[in-house]
Structures are given as structure tokens and as C-alpha cells.
Design a protein with these regions (language model features):
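Midchain, well-structured core segments that form catalytic/ion-binding scaffolds
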Residues: 1-104, 108-110, 124-133
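Surface-exposed helix-capping loop/turn segments at secondary-structure junctions
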Residues: 20-24, 81-85, 116-118, 181-190
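Zn-dependent metallopeptidase/amidohydrolase metal-coordination segment
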Residues: 120-177, 181-233
Length: 233
């Protein structure tokens, strides 16, 4: 019979091979897991397999390219085994972009509050994502961290060691940044806003992007004669 798990394996291998085409493979993220069906027993031929796929990239343009290429990989996998394919796409977070001028304001304030040896200035972009990425696609942002030397966040052992530093001093940092931005009739804030080139010029453009990548597509189907019908981009 038609084995959808085999089709999924072909598709996942094809998508994995896309990493070799990326000029920024260290920040490209593709991950996939079979989350449903795929065979109830070793000797069963699975008629339905569900794969959950996630993508990350440093820019929206790269993310769109990856989405297109990964769709093609799964279309190829389905076609190779003669099975149908439905692709359900939902948008996650936009890649995070940071405003260098806003970073410098944060650093200037930090130098008044923290010892020099405890301040790290890096412009390296992280592939980590959160809703700050969506905000940064429209307005200047900074995603700074204030730590107290305790266990790393996102770990079981994470806890606060220095409550004053993490509460009061961190609050002083944020207020200090606001004072710098809003002083002199918000001159610095206006300068940063004018220099920033957002991913989306308008909120409407951002919403259109979100809508474009929220869809369900019957990417591979067959007519009554068994002729394949491709509906992917």
C-alpha cells in the first residue's frame, strides 16, 4: 500500500539537505517531528502521517524563502510515494532585529549602574525568537539582559540570587533609558525612530504578512485517473 511514513521520511531528508544551500546555516533553523499516526505497529502501512515542522531565520525574506523550499521538499516526498499532502501553515514570531543606536543608549546607562567588567556589548544576532521580533519589525527595539550570575534561564535550576540587582537596579536601568530617550523634547527617541528601517513600513503590511502565511493548502492531490495535481507555490 501507499506508505505515508516513507513519504514523510523522504520529505524530511530533502528538507534537511536544504541546510547546505544556506549561507547562514548557523542561524537557520529547521526542525521536524512526527507527531501523529505514522503507523500503529511495525507491520502496519500507515495511511496518514502528521509532521510538525518549525522554521527560524534571521530575516523575514530568508524565512519566506525557507518556507517555500521546505514546502517543495514535502511536495517532493509526497509525490515520490504517490500520497496526498496537505500543508497547514501558521505564522510564528518574526526574526528579532535590534536597533544599534538604542543598544548604545542602554549601554551608556548600564555603565552608570554596573561595574565595567560585568557589561558585555555584542552586536551578534540571535536566532532566538519571541514576540519582541514582531515588535522590532515595526519599531526600534533592544533586547538586553540583566543577570545576577545565577543559573541560566530556561533551566530547572533557574532562580534569582540577587533580588536587589534583578529588581531595583534593573528598574533603574529601564527608567534611565527612558530619561535618555525622552529628554530634550524626546530628541534621541526621534533620532532613533527616523534612522530605523523597519521590516514592514506599515502595520497593514505586517498584518498582510501574517495573513499570507496562515493557510491550509492541498499541495499534492490526484484526479480520478491518478494524475498528480500540484498546488504548491
Amino acid at each position: 500500500g501507499l506508505n505515508t511514513m516513507n513519504a514523510a521520511l523522504v520529505a524530511m531528508n530533502a528538507a534537511n539537505a536544504l541546510r547546505e544551500r544556506s549561507v547562514d546555516a548557523l542561524h537557520m533553523r529547521y526542525y521536524a517531528n512526527v507527531v501523529d499516526n505514522g503507523g500503529g505497529a511495525p507491520n502496519n502501512v500507515p495511511m496518514r502521517t502528521v509532521v510538525d515542522v518549525g522554521l527560524r531565520a534571521l530575516t523575514v525574506k530568508k524565512l519566506e524563502e525557507m518556507s517555500r523550499d521546505v514546502d517543495r521538499a514535502y511536495i517532493a516526498g509526497a509525490y515520490s510515494q504517490g500520497v496526498r499532502l496537505e500543508i497547514q501553515t501558521t505564522i510564528g514570531y518574526c526574526p528579532r532585529r535590534e536597533s544599534r543606536p538604542l543598544q548604545l543608549v542602554f549601554l551608556d546607562v548600564a555603565k552608570r549602574l554596573f561595574p565595567k567588567e560585568e557589561i558585555s556589548d555584542t552586536e551578534n544576532t540571535s536566532a532566538g525568537v519571541s514576540d519582541i521580533g514582531d515588535i522590532s519589525s515595526l519599531i526600534p527595539t533592544v533586547h538586553a539582559f540583566i543577570g545576577d550570575g545565577g543559573p541560566s534561564n530556561h533551566t530547572v535550576k533557574f532562580h534569582i540570587i540577587d533580588k536587589y540587582r534583578m529588581g531595583v537596579t534593573a528598574a533603574k536601568e529601564q527608567v534611565g533609558v527612558l530619561l535618555e530617550l525622552l529628554g530634550d523634547n524626546a530628541a534621541k527617541a526621534k533620532e532613533i525612530m527616523e534612522e530605523y528601517k523597519p521590516t514592514f513600513a506599515r502595520r497593514e503590511d505586517y498584518l498582510a504578512f501574517e495573513e499570507k502565511y496562515t493557510k491550509t493548502l492541498k499541495a499534492v492531490d490526484y484526479d480520478a485517473d491518478g494524475k498528480v495535481l500540484f498546488k504548491g507555490e
